[in-house]
Amino acid sequence: MQKQHDFADYTAIEPQARIDSATHGWRAKCLQRLVRLGLPVPQSVALSFETVHAIAGGRMPDTARLLSLFNGGELVSVRPSSENTDWGGPGTILNIGMNDARHAQLAERHGEAAATRLYLQFVQVYSTHVARLDPDLFETGEPDAAALAEALRAYAGEMDEPFPQDPARQLSEVLRSMARAWEGTSARLLRQAKGAPADAGLGLVVQAMALGIGQGDCGSGVIQFVSEQTGEPQVTGRFLAQAQGRAALTAGEGALYLTRDPRGPSLQERYPDCFAELLRHGRVCRRKLREEMQIEFTLESGRLWVLDAVPAPRSSRANVRISVALADDGIITREEALLRVPPRSLGELLHPQVDPRGKRDVVARGIGASPGAARGRVAFTSTAAQAMASRGEPCILVRRETTPEDIRGMHAAVAVLTERGGMTSHAAVIGRGLGLPCVVGASGIRIDARAERLFVPDGRSFGEGDTITVDGTRGEVLAGAVDLLEPALDDTFRTLQAWAAAVCDIGIRANADTPADARMARSFDAQGIGLCRTEHMFFEDSRLTLMREMIFADTAEDRSAALERLLPMQRADFIDLFGIMQGLPVCIRLFDPPLHEFLPHGREGLRQLADALDRPLSEITRRAEALAEFNPMLGMRGVRLGITLPEIYDMQARAIFEATVEASRHGAPVVPEIMIPLVSARREVELVKSRIDAVAAAVRVERGVNFTYRLGVMVETPRAALRAGEIANHSDFLSFGTNDLTQMTYGLSRDDAGRFMNAYVQKGVFPEDPFHVLDPDGVGELLLLGASRGRSQRPEITLSICGEHGGNPDSIAFCRAAGFDYVSCSSFRVPVARLAAAHLVLQEGATRPEADV
C-alpha cells in the first residue's frame, strides 16, 4: 500500500484516507472507492470544501508541495467535486503543468504533433477559463506549431507577460479560478435551482494525467452499461484515439463505437483486452458501488486508466428500470429503490414526452399545467376541434381560456393551450383529469379568434390547421411536429408502484368524473374516487338540451319534468362508475357550478337555443341576462342551488341511490359517498341532509332493498373550516376543496393569477404558487383548524383533500402530518402521489446505506 499523505489543505486519495462526500464531495469519495476496489485510478489528491472556500477568499495552499506528491513532475488535471452530482461545478481543466520544457520532453517521447496539440489545448483552456480572456483570440485552425506560437503571443499581448511556465503557479491560478467560479452569484443561483443549499461547498480533485496521446495504443473514451433512454442492459459510449477527456462524445465519425457495430469499427474489435477489462470494472462498480455507473477512461500506450466514474445519465424511465433491477438483483433494498425515484419524475413515464435528442423551436412559454407532449393542428374553437378529430386529425385546442362549454373540444383535442390561467384554472384541472398535455398562462401569445390566428412573441403567427407541439411538462409551445417518446407503463413501473403501495400509509384516491375517468383511475390502482364532479356529465348534446330546459322552466313542476328525463342518464352513469370501481369508495359531489355556465355565448348560440326550446329569442335573451352574475364563483352555485332549487339535488340523490341498488345487485356492495359543495353554514347541511335522507327512505321502500350511504361536506370556504366542529355533527366526512379554499383565503382568481404569479414568487412575496403547492401557513392553518374542530366533535370523521394539491408531494406531506385519511388527485397523478407518500414513510427512519467499499 502506498504511503498516506494527509496535510491540512489536501488529502491523498488512498484507501484509508479520511474522505467523505460531505466534506470532500461525491467525486473524491467515489475515486477513493474505485481505489479500494483495485481499479487502475491515476494518483489523486482531494481538497476539502473548507480548503476551496479559503482559496476563494485568497488563502492559497502550498501548490509546489502538493505537486511533489505526484511522480516525476507529471501533468495534472483538476476536477470539481460537489456534494451532489446534480449540483454541477466548474469544468474540468486538463494538462496543468504544460510548459515549454514539458513540451520538449513530450515531443521526444510521443512526437512533435502530439506534444504541440497538448500544449495548444492547455493554452487555450487556461487563457479562456482561468485568465478569462476573449475566446475569439484563441480560435485556431490546425493544431500545429504556428497555431501554438500565435496562442502564446495572444496571451502575452493581453496579459503583458509571457504564458506562465511554473506548474505550481498554473495550479494555483486554476484552483483560485474554479473556487471563485463556484462562489459566484450565477453559479449559486444555478445550483440552488437544482436543490442545493445556498452555502453548498465544493471540493476539488487534483489528478495525475493519463495522456491518451502519444505512441502506441492511446485514446480516451466514456462507457456505460445501460441504455440512457430505457435503462435496459446495453453497452454505450464512444472511444477516440489520440484524445483526452470526454472528446470522444463529440468527435463524430472519428470515434469508435464500443461494441461491434455495422456502422463502423469498435473498441471491442480494435482493443479486445481493454474492452473486456472495462466490462469487468462495470460489473464490479454495479455490485460494490450499488449503482449503474458511467466510466471515463484513458488508454495510454496500451494501459487502461479509469479517470472518473459517475452515476450513468438516465431518463426518468431508465431510472425506474435501473432502480428496480438493482433491487431485484439483491444489490439494494426495495426501500432504497423507491427512494431513488423522485416522485415528480413519474409524470414523464405516464405521458408522451418531447424527445430530448431533437431540436426545439420554442415559440412561446407558459405554465406547464398538465404534463406530457402532443403535436397537432391548431383549432380555435371546440367545434373546430371536434371536426378535426372526426377526420382523424390530431388537434391542439387554443383558447384565451376554457370554460365548461369547451369540454367536448377538450375531449376531442390531444392538448390544450390557453393565454390565461394558472395551475388550478379550468383548462389545467380538466387537462390533468383527461391526461391532456396543457400549457396555460402563456401571456406572451395573442389569440385573434375572429381572424383565427395565434401570434407568438417572435412575430410569427399560426393559423387554424397549422401544426404546433405543446410540451406540458416544460410549459413550452414548439413550432411544427417534433419527435416524441411514448409512455413507459411497463412491468418495472408497476413493480415500483406495488412496492410503494405496500409502504404508503395514507389513502390515495382519484378525481374521476366519467366512466372513462374511473377506468383510468382503476388502471393506476387508485383506492377509490375522492371527487366525482357530476356537472361534467351534463355537457353531452342530449343532456345539455335537457339541462337548458330545466334552467328555463317556469315552475317547479316543469323543472321536475326536465330533471325526470335526466334521471335515467345520471343513474346509468353512476351504475357504470360503481361497476368499474367494484366496491371501492366513490365520493360524488352534488351539482356545483352556476347555471349560466350551461348557456350558450353569443347571439347565434342564443338563437339556436330559442329554436330548440321553441321560445322567443327575446325571452331567452332576457332570462340569460337575468342568470348572469357579477362574481359567479361566489354567487348562486353549490349548496345555494341545492337549497333554492332543491329538485336538482333530489334528482341526483335518487340517481345515486337507485344506481347503488342496481350495482350492488350485480357486483360488490356499494356504499356511496355524497358530498355537498360550497357549504359555509351548519344550517345548509341540515336542509340538504333532510331532503337526501327522505329520498333514500323513498328508494328503500320502492325497491324493497336496504342500503347505506355516507354524507359529507366539501370544505372550500374559510367559514366552513372555522365552523367545522358544528358542521361535523351532521357529516360523515370533511373533504377540503383546496382549489376554491385557496382562492377565497388569498382573494385570488385562479384563472387570472398566472399573469403575476411568477413575479410574486421571484420577488419572494409567495414562496411557491399557492395553487400548485399548498400554502402551509394560511390555507394550511385553516385545514388544521377544520380538522381539529371536526374531530373534536366527531373523532371518527374521515378527513381528506380533493383539490389538485392532492397530487403534490409537499402537500401530501402536510396532509399526512395533519392526520388526514386520504388525498385525492387526478388519475394521472395517482402514481406520483403514492410514491411521494411512500417516500415520507421511508424518510422518517431511513438513512441511505453506503456503497460496499
Language-model-detected regions and their locations in the chain:
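ATP-binding N-terminal substructure of ATP-dependent carboxylate-amine bond-forming enzymes
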Residues: 1-2, 442, 782, 815
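Metal-dependent nuclease catalytic cores in nucleic-acid-processing enzymes
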Residues: 279-285, 438, 784-789
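Nucleotide/phosphate-binding sheet-loop regions of phosphoryl- and nucleotidyl-transfer enzymes
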Residues: 1-361, 383-389, 393-396, 403-408, ...
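Structural motif
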Residues: 398-400, 419, 441, 511, ...
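Long, charged amphipathic helices and adjacent flexible linkers at domain junctions
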Residues: 193-195, 338-388, 393-394, 476-509, ...
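Conserved alpha/beta-domain cores
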Residues: 489-492, 499-853
